[in-house]
Amino acid sequence: ADENFKKLAAMFPNAVTETINENGEVVRAIDKDVLMQEISCKVVDGNEERYQFTWPDKKKSVLLANAPINRTLRPVREDETVPTGADSEGKPYCSTGSVDFDTTENLYIEGDNLEVLKLLQETYLGKIKMIYIDPPYNTGNDFVYNDEFGIRSEEWNDTSGNYDADGNQIVGALEKNTEANGRFHTDWLNMIYPRLRLAKDLLSDDGVIFISIDENEIENVIKLGCEVFGEANHLGEIIVKSNPRGSMSTAEIASLHEYLVIFSKNRLDCKIVGHLLTEDMSSEYKFSDAEGNYRLLGLRMRGGFWRRSDRPKLYYPIYINPKTGLISLEKSDEYCEEALPIQPSTMEDGTWRWSRDKVKAEGHLLLGKSVTRNGETCWDVYQKDYLIKGDKERRTKAKSIWDEPEINYQNGTVEIKSLFSKGGIFDYSKPVFLLMRIFEMLDLKDEDVILDFFSGSATTAHAVIKYNCETSKRCKFIMVQLPEKCAEKSEAYK
């Protein structure tokens, strides 16, 4: 709230005034009437109809995001153990010491992620390049953070049990959100909304957030994202084929996929560079010269406004040296073969993709070739499209459907099993491949910081380490996870 006040005060200093608060103290405030005059546009007020996305307790959720806290982050060094909670009998369980605490550049933070996000504002405001979160999906069988009644660490020793009056299991600050709960979507929205607001402030201007979600809350995630980050910064959704066999959780349709919802902090600064080419794609670059491998792209416009009548200035002759294939805009004894952008099937006059000026400046990238069309020999012009331009390898735009076999979420379970030599440690872990695909889309650089505040099995941390090893980069991660007591019969506890 203080930051928002400072921003308004900087933009509209004449709207800053003083008033008396509930304690009788003189405090600075914003004069609403002056602010409305400065904005000088239509303002929706009171009960006037407007388009909005709202739910019960939304105002409290906004206040929760802005409310200050009196907590701090405590380091856990190599030779320390720190109590992080207690079971129903009051028996404490602890976090073990760090590894190379004074030299590591990565952080694993145990605590309520809402509080941690507020604490991170002090050091990481505007410094996080990428955020990935895999929040509770609100399936009716998972848990959401109960921020209003959540049990904080200092209260855990006083708790009398793991179930509330309605029989819902309580684990730390987590509460089961069943469909029988009349506040089913409301509770989930009140959990995620303040966290997204705080997450936005942590992102750098070119930062991006990726949110994994399924059909239960996909619509609400998009609406929330548009409100928090702005509709113009909604980069889209990727359908992730996570379960090729199909989920049996619904009676009518077996779902094969989940979603990856993407928002940028500022779309103009954000760069989604796409993915490196597959071997099949690279094989298209079958020609080579001193500059490297390339493919040939026809210079004639194939789609859109391709007719001469649409763009008459892009219809002009190009002359070709039949011995070398080199081109010129001027006809001569050397450049004697003429090429025109003629549509082959209809023989209509078309257009080139390049203007005369561009051909003059970059003609070294063009090549004339003899071709046969409609039984006759003629000449056409092609562009050399190189696999590597400068020091950048060619990439392909990220697609809206990811269905690679490696993205099957069963692989996440296999990866966890390979790390611990047994299964059952974590349920529904994301595969490292999913995060690696995301990192590749952004072409992460040295010192970029990746945040995951629903860390779970820490797949994101695993992926950052793997990415650094494979690319020789030095990206860093911050993982945040609420400490949870494992059931004594579970594989994770054993």
Regions found by a protein language model. Give the residues of each.
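Conserved class I S-adenosyl-L-methionine
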Residues: E447-G456
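Phosphate/ATP-binding catalytic cores across multiple sugar-kinase/actin-like superfamilies
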Residues: N113-V116, L120-T123, M191-L196, D201-D205, ...
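Active-site-adjacent helix-turn-beta-strand microarchitecture at beta-sheet edges
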Residues: N266-K417
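Active-site-adjacent "gating/activation" loops or surface patches in catalytic cores
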Residues: S153-N168, D391-K430
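Signature of N6-adenine DNA methyltransferases within the class I
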Residues: I192, D205-D206, E215-S282
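SAM-dependent methyltransferase catalytic-core segment centered on the flexible catalytic loop
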Residues: K127-V208, N216, A232, H257, ...
